[in-house]
Amino acid sequence: AVVAGLSQVVVEALAAGHNVLLYPAGQLTNSGLEHVGNKQGAWQVCNQLPGDARVVGMRIRGLWGSMWSRAKTGRSPNFAWTYLKGIFYVLANLLFFVPKRDVTIIFEDITDGTVHYAAEGRQPFNRFLESFYNAPGEEQPLFLKHFFYVRGRGY
């Protein structure tokens, strides 16, 4: 009932011309592949999509292996502790020398596919989303060192 209620609010916002950001999987990924599984929120919204609304898929690559990901431990990092460590790393690296990672963000209009697969059902729709997110293949974790003055890679 909660998901249906939220989906209705999102559909009404789209009908009113507002932009809405949805994260279909609703969680951090457990691997280098996105897994939508049996989630239903995005499917419910796209199944009732107002005629003039557009769906823009956003694929992000380069974050798997960051201190915010589950790549190292398999568990979600503690937000407060990770945030404090991040502040320490910025200060310890004299702000300008923080090791950086290449992050790619790709936006693509996937309206036609979402409308088509939403009409076919939740599972085909979710498989379509997974195929979009995972099109480049499985992302390998990249563990960067946290201090510019330490030799080697990883942490």
Locate each region found by the language model:
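Active-site metal-binding loops of divalent metal-dependent hydrolases
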Residues: 26
